[in-house]
Amino acid sequence: MKQKVVNIGDIKVANDLPFVLFGGMNVLESRDLAMRICEHYVTVTQKLGIPYVFKASFDKANRSSIHSYRGPGLEEGMKIFQELKQTFGVKVITDVHEASQVQPVADVVDVIQLPAFLARQTDLVEAMAKTGAVINVKKPQFVSPGQMGNIVDKFHEGGNDKVILCDRGANFGYDNLVVDMLGFSVMKKVSGNSPVIFDVTHALQCRDPFGAASGGRRGQVTELARAGMAVGLAGLFLESHPDPANAKCDGPSALPLAKLEQFLTQIKAIDDLVKSFDELDTEN
């Protein structure tokens, strides 16, 4: 079955092409740390031959506590992204939370992300669609894979068909997430075979029911990523940190930066193997 291709400059994103890594840090903590992390990702992905897009948030607007670190903000964040692009020649993805942020972000980055908690907000979707930029839609934890087609339709109605879908798990009772491996193919089907990627980092979140910060299961990142990529996906969404214990956001789910090359070597091997198989139709 023909898969839709979304182009991010010279990077082609599709379910049957070699996977694209959307990787970086959760939130911009400083200019120097962003440069360090991006440089390491660029070095490793070039060595392994993996198409790469840098990711980070300039503002974590949905933190559980008002006292939690949010990021440098829009203006400073765009300056850092511009420097990363100029220094390393990378494409950049970041998320927006308000319609007023959309155009200033679209002027700098290559992919605009629609956060999971906001994925059904029509005004925000319409503002994002109008930019003509590539869009990454995070599947809300409370929305079934089959309902994602409705969100894609909103973008199409807004004149934008450059849509990537991203799964980050579903609510499983209180304060826990699970990933439905069968949901990936459902998302492909209802979106006209749009590229589907897997946010393994946020799928590892496991909240303290009485706390103000998310916990995580970093020790299981490799097995969960291997399982997801074995389905045959367009890309992997990954966050790393040189010192996860002291990261300002979601450290418990972040891959230690020093383990990146070993981790990606395994993921690439699985992706290469799965995509070497002929398509097998078991419905007929």
Swiss-Prot record:
Query: What UniProt keywords apply to this chain's record, in alphabetical order?
Result: Cytoplasm, Lipopolysaccharide biosynthesis, Transferase
Under the heading InterPro entries, the entry gives:
Aldolase_TIM, DAHP1/KDSA, KDO8P_synthase
Q: Which GO terms describe its biological process?
A: keto-3-deoxy-D-manno-octulosonic acid biosynthetic process
Q: What is its EC number?
A: 2.5.1.55
Determine if Cytoplasm is one of this entry's keywords.
yes
Q: Name one Pfam family in it.
A: DAHP_synth_1
Catalytic activity line of the entry: D-arabinose 5-phosphate + phosphoenolpyruvate + H2O = 3-deoxy-alpha-D-manno-2-octulosonate-8-phosphate + phosphate
A GO MF annotation of the entry reads: 3-deoxy-8-phosphooctulonate synthase activity
Can you list the GO cellular component terms from the UniProt entry? cytoplasm
Its annotated pathway reads: Carbohydrate biosynthesis; 3-deoxy-D-manno-octulosonate biosynthesis; 3-deoxy-D-manno-octulosonate from D-ribulose 5-phosphate: step 2/3; Bacterial outer membrane biogenesis; lipopolysaccharide biosynthesis
Q: Where in the cell is it found?
A: Cytoplasm
Give the record's family classification. Answer: Belongs to the KdsA family.
Output this protein's name: 2-dehydro-3-deoxyphosphooctonate aldolase
Q: Which organism is it from?
A: Salmonella paratyphi A (strain AKU_12601)
